[in-house]
C-alpha cells in the first residue's frame, strides 16, 4: 500500500513519469528519493512484477520512505553514485531529481537556507563528512575563492572569501547561516534583481561540501551500465552547472565517434538517443515558484554496450 504525509511538491512530477514510458513489469531507479513523489507515482503504474529501487543520502528521506508499505519498493541509504552496484542492463528507467529539496531548505537545522537561521551544516548526509562550518574554519582564501567562483558562479568570490577570512580573524569561526549571510552581504555590494546576495555563495558551498557535481558525473556514467536497451534516463536539474553536465553527457553519448588513429574503422555506435528537454509550465511555476529553474532532459538507451 502506498501512503504518506509528505507536503513537498515534486517538480515536473507527471512529465517525468511520462518521459520514462513506464513498463508495468519494469524495474525503475528513483536515484534521489527526496520525499518520494516520483516513487509513489511510479508504483501506482506498476504491476505486481514491477519494482522501484530508490537511493538517498538524507536520513529524513530514509525515514519518509518507511511510510511506503509495498513489497515492490526498497530504498538504499546511499548517494546515487552507487547506481553501478545494480546488475548490468537490469532497469527500465533511471530518474534523477537533482539538488536540494524544499523540506531540506525549509528546515533551519539543516543549514541550507540563508533565510532561516540555523547551524551552518548543509550536508545531505549528516552522518558523515565535514559541515560547511567545519570546512570554512580552516579553508584558505584561495580555496574559498575557487569554490565560490566555480560552484556559485559568483563574480565577487574573492571579496566574499576575504570577508569570511576577516570575520574569522576578528570574531572567530562562522557557526550559523545568518552569520555567513551577513558576511556575504557586506562583501557583495551590487544586487541581482530578485536574488539575495548570499544565494550564489550558499549554492557553491552546498555543491562543494556534498561533491554534487562529481557524484552526478559518476551516476550518469553508471546509468549507461544499468539501463537495458530502450530504457529511459530522465534528469531534472535546477541550475546551469548541473544542466550543463547532463546536456554534455547526453550529447557525448548520442553521436557516433570516429577514431582518428583508425580512419577506416567503423565508428563507435552511440549509447544514448537524446529525446529533448522540458521546462515547468507557467501553471506549475505559478503554484510552485521553485520549479521556475527546473530543466528536465530525457534520453533513451541504445543497444550498444557501455
UniProtKB/Swiss-Prot annotation:
<dbReference type="GO" id="GO:0070475">
    <property type="term" value="P:rRNA base methylation"/>
</dbReference>
<feature type="binding site">
    <location>
        <position position="80"/>
    </location>
    <ligand>
        <name>S-adenosyl-L-methionine</name>
    </ligand>
</feature>
<dbReference type="GO" id="GO:0071424">
    <property type="term" value="F:rRNA (cytosine-N4-)-methyltransferase activity"/>
</dbReference>
<keyword id="KW-0808">Transferase</keyword>
<feature type="binding site">
    <location>
        <position position="104"/>
    </location>
    <ligand>
        <name>S-adenosyl-L-methionine</name>
    </ligand>
</feature>
<dbReference type="InterPro" id="IPR023397">
    <property type="entry name" value="SAM-dep_MeTrfase_MraW_recog"/>
</dbReference>
<feature type="binding site">
    <location>
        <position position="97"/>
    </location>
    <ligand>
        <name>S-adenosyl-L-methionine</name>
    </ligand>
</feature>
<dbReference type="InterPro" id="IPR029063">
    <property type="entry name" value="SAM-dependent_MTases_sf"/>
</dbReference>
<comment type="similarity">
    <text>Belongs to the methyltransferase superfamily. RsmH family.</text>
</comment>
<feature type="binding site">
    <location>
        <position position="56"/>
    </location>
    <ligand>
        <name>S-adenosyl-L-methionine</name>
    </ligand>
</feature>
<keyword id="KW-0698">rRNA processing</keyword>
<keyword id="KW-0489">Methyltransferase</keyword>
<protein>
    <recommendedName>
        <fullName>Ribosomal RNA small subunit methyltransferase H</fullName>
        <ecNumber>2.1.1.199</ecNumber>
    </recommendedName>
</protein>
<comment type="function">
    <text>Specifically methylates the N4 position of cytidine in position 1402 (C1402) of 16S rRNA.</text>
</comment>
<dbReference type="Pfam" id="PF01795">
    <property type="entry name" value="Methyltransf_5"/>
</dbReference>
<dbReference type="InterPro" id="IPR002903">
    <property type="entry name" value="RsmH"/>
</dbReference>
<feature type="region of interest" description="Disordered">
    <location>
        <begin position="280"/>
        <end position="306"/>
    </location>
</feature>
<feature type="binding site">
    <location>
        <begin position="36"/>
        <end position="38"/>
    </location>
    <ligand>
        <name>S-adenosyl-L-methionine</name>
    </ligand>
</feature>
<dbReference type="GO" id="GO:0005737">
    <property type="term" value="C:cytoplasm"/>
</dbReference>
<keyword id="KW-0963">Cytoplasm</keyword>
<keyword id="KW-0949">S-adenosyl-L-methionine</keyword>
Amino acid at each position: 500500500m502506498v501512503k504518506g504525509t509528505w507536503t513537498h511538491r515534486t517538480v515536473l512530477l507527471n512529465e517525468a513519469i511520462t518521459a520514462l514510458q513506464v513498463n508495468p513489469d519494469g524495474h525503475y531507479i528513483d536515484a534521489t528519493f527526496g520525499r518520494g513523489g516520483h516513487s509513489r507515482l511510479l508504483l501506482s503504474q506498476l504491476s505486481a512484477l514491477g519494482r522501484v529501487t530508490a537511493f538517498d543520502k538524507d536520513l529524513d528521506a530514509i525515514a519518509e520512505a518507511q511510510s511506503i508499505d509495498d513489497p515492490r519498493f526498497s530504498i538504499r541509504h546511499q548517494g546515487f553514485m552507487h547506481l553501478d552496484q545494480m546488475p548490468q542492463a537490469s532497469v527500465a528507467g533511471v530518474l534523477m531529481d537533482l539538488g536540494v529539496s524544499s523540506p531540506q531548505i525549509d528546515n533551519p537545522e539543516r543549514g541550507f537556507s540563508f533565510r532561516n537561521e540555523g547551524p551552518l551544516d548543509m550536508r545531505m548526509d549528516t552522518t558523515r563528512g565535514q559541515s560547511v562550518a567545519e570546512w570554512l574554519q580552516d579553508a584558505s582564501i584561495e580555496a574559498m575563492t575557487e569554490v565560490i567562483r566555480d560552484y556559485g558562479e559568483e563574480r565577487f568570490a574573492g571579496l566574499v572569501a576575504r570577508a569570511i577570512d576577516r570575520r574569522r580573524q576578528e570574531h572567530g569561526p562562522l557557526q550559523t547561516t545568518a552569520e555567513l549571510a551577513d558576511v556575504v552581504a557586506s562583501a557583495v555590494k551590487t544586487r541581482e534583481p530578485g536574488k539575495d546576495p548570499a544565494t550564489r555563495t550558499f549554492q557553491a558551498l552546498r555543491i562543494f561540501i556534498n561533491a554534487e557535481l562529481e557524484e552526478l558525473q559518476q551516476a550518469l556514467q553508471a546509468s549507461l551500465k544499468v539501463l537495458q536497451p530502450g530504457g529511459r534516463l530522465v534528469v531534472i536539474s535546477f541550475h546551469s552547472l548541473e544542466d550543463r553536465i547532463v546536456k554534455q553527457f547526453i550529447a557525448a553519448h548520442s553521436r557516433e565517434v570516429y577514431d582518428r588513429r583508425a580512419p577506416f574503422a567503423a565508428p563507435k555506435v552511440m549509447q544514448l538517443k537524446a529525446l529533448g528537454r522540458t521546462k515547468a509550465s507557467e501553471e506549475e511555476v505559478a503554484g510552485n515558484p521553485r520549479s521556475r529553474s527546473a530543466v528536465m532532459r530525457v534520453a533513451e538507451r541504445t543497444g550498444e554496450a557501455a
